[in-house]
Every structure is written in C-alpha cells, then in structure tokens.
C-alpha cells in the first residue's frame, strides 16, 4: 500500500470517530439536562474512576496510557459541556460580578503607591507608566511593599514579577504565597541598563560594580568582559547608583537606569549593556481589595493541586476545553511541604466571556487551595 492509501483509511476512521464523538457529546448534554432538572452535580467522581479503570483494564498494554489519556480528555469535555448547561456558579463568580459592578470606570491617577527601592528604581519608573502622578512611598524590601498594602498604608503597590532575559523574580513569587493581595493592572517596562560612575571616572578605573541581582544576570556578558572587576549585589539598581554617588570614589560604578544619571549626578561609561536589546520586565500593580476595571483581559491564579498523577493535567484540560490561552505557568515549592508546589497561572481571557465565568465556577473544585488574584489589563 502507498502512504496515500493509509491516509485514506485514517480519514475514513476519523469520519466515524467524529460522528460517534458528536453523538456522545449530545448524550452528555442530555445527561446534563437531567442533572439540572434533578439538582445533581456535574461530576460523579466515583463513576469516572470506575470507568477509567475499566477502560485501562480492557485496553492493549501498548495502548493503555494513550487510551486512558483520550478518555480522560473526553470526560473533561463532557463535564465542561454539562457545567455550561447547569450554569455552574460559586462564591468566587459572585465576588467577580460584584467587583465589575462597583469598580470605577477609570483607573486612578494620583493614588498612594508603594514600591521597592529609591528614586530612579525601575519599580518607580513602572509607577510612572501606570499612574499619571503617583504619590510614591519607597520600601526597603518587596515584603514591605506587600505589607504596606495589607495594612492600608498605600492603596497600591508595584512589584516586578518576571524579566524577558533573567526569567521570573522568584523572591516575589515566594512572597505571593505569604500575603493577601489582588492584582489590578500590569505593565511591561523596557529595561535599559547603563554603567554609571562619578564624574571623571574612566572605564579603566573601575574595580567594583554595584547592582541588583536581576540586573547583574541581565548584563552577564558585559560583566564577563571586565576581568578583575568585583560585582557587588545591592537591594536595587537605584540604591546601587546612590551608593556610587555617595562613595566619593572613581573606581566604583553601578548598573542602573538612565534616570539615575540626573538624579545622582553620575555619568554613563557605557549604555545599553544588557545581554538582550529587547529586554523587558513585567510589573504588577497590587491592591488589598478586588478591583476589575473595564477591558480586563488577563487573569492571574494560584493553586495547590492534589498530590497525585493527573492533577495538573485536569486543570490544563479545562483551559483547553474552554479555548482559554495560558500565558504563564510557574511553580514554587511550598515551605515545609516536601515535593508539593504552588502553581501560578496567567490566563488570556476576557473577564466578561461566558467561558471565563464557567472556568471560575469549575476550578476551585479541582484544587486543594485556590486563590483568584485578579483580572486586569496590561499596559504595553
């Protein structure tokens, strides 16, 4: 037989499979109608487990895993169809509806905003992108930014979560597990690192370079080209620039933003020294209370899933079944819980779509712990 003959066989089989799949989904919808009429839940976990075991036992050993995966997905699709018919709701969906109805139409222009660092830090530049004229309060640590929000000292906080070169800011993701907050907006900020020193300093004079660990990582190739130079970590890039300005020395420099040149009376010895020219950091704006502004098309979630095979797959298959795009998946180990993780998800979906509402009704039941962090727009 030729390849075309095999493909014709596959096409014929696919036609039969599709007809049976449509028939199966139609019966699943009728079951959903019955469950709705008799006030029954969409999920019958015992029946699903028994059915999957029966399928696994009857399948050829070489195809057992494939068969179980296929039927697991079909069960997810059937349940999603039934949930839509049942109009699944939860306290979370009610909370989201309330936030949409009571959030003002315009994002605030002059609020009190906490950020880590000092004047000239990239977090402060992100504040300026998010707000017209923010009243910025500087904190020594990211932890202090979260605390300022929880205690009501500031309405908002701005924190970095990931960089296009260096990846996720793990310290921030770890703090997310310890604090109560909501995300109300995000921004992507172009990061352009300069090597700054006191007036009169020459590149050949530099013996020490100060900066934040993320900036150091983003400029690794440049730093490797400077043999004999010691790299010193600081709490943030602007603090590094300030330290250089106050040192009285011409043999030290800082990797910091161009804004620090005028702020601290420094000069640029080298510009755009990051490894990648297309270098962006994503910041999120956090608040104590849930606010959902018009146009929200991104959602962030945190989940602890049951510690058993297939738990993550069940969540991902929900996204797939509802046609919801996953922008980010991050996992962080849970403190004092061996080999267990908190999963962080960023989803691309309109907060107004029926698929989003259905997802928010279904997901909490799949998790040991579930946190809806917010739905928001990203400024680019």
Q: What are the language-model segments listed below?
A:
Residues 1-380:
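Domain-level signature for soluble enzymes in the chorismate/prephenate branch of the shikimate pathway
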């Amino acid at each position: 037989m030729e390849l075309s003959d095999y493909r014709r066989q596959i096409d014929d089989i696919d036609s039969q499979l599709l007809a049976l799949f449509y028939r199966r989904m139609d019966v699943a919808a009728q079951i959903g109608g019955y469950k709705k009429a008799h006030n029954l839940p969409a999920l019958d976990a015992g029946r699903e487990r028994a059915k999957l075991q029966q399928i696994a036992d009857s399948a050829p050993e070489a195809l057992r895993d494939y068969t179980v995966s296929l039927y697991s997905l079909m069960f997810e699709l059937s349940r999603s169809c039934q949930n839509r018919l049942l109009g699944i709701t939860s306290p979370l969906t009610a909370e989201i509806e309330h936030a949409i109805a009571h959030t003002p139409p315009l994002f605030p222009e002059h609020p009190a905003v906490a950020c880590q660092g000092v004047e000239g830090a990239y977090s402060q530049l992100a504040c300026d992108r998010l707000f017209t004229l923010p009243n910025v309060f500087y904190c020594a640590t990211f932890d202090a930014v979260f605390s300022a929000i929880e205690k009501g000292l500031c309405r908002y906080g701005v924190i970095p979560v990931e960089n296009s070169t260096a990846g996720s800011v793990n310290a921030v993701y770890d703090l997310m597990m310890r604090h109560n907050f909501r995300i109300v907006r995000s921004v992507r900020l172009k990061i352009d690192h300069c090597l700054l020193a006191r007036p009169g300093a020459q590149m050949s004079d530099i013996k020490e370079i100060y900066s934040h660990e993320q900036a150091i990582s983003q400029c690794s190739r440049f730093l490797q080209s400077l043999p004999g130079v010691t790299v010193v970590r600081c709490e943030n890039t602007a603090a590094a620039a300030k330290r250089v300005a106050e040192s009285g020395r011409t043999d030290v420099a800082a990797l910091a933003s161009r804004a620090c040149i005028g702020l601290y009376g420094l000069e640029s010895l080298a510009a755009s020294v990051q490894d990648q020219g297309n270098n962006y950091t994503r910041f999120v704006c956090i608040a104590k209370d849930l606010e959902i502004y018009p146009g929200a098309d991104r959602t962030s979630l945190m989940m602890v899933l049951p510690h058993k095979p297939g738990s993550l797959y069940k969540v991902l298959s929900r996204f797939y079944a509802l046609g919801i795009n996953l922008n980010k998946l991050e996992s962080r180990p849970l403190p004092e819980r061996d080999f267990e993780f908190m999963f962080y998800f960023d989803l691309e979906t309109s907060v107004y779509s029926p698929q989003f509402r259905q997802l928010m009704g279904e997901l909490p039941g799949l998790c040991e712990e579930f946190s809806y962090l917010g739905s928001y727009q990203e400024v680019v």
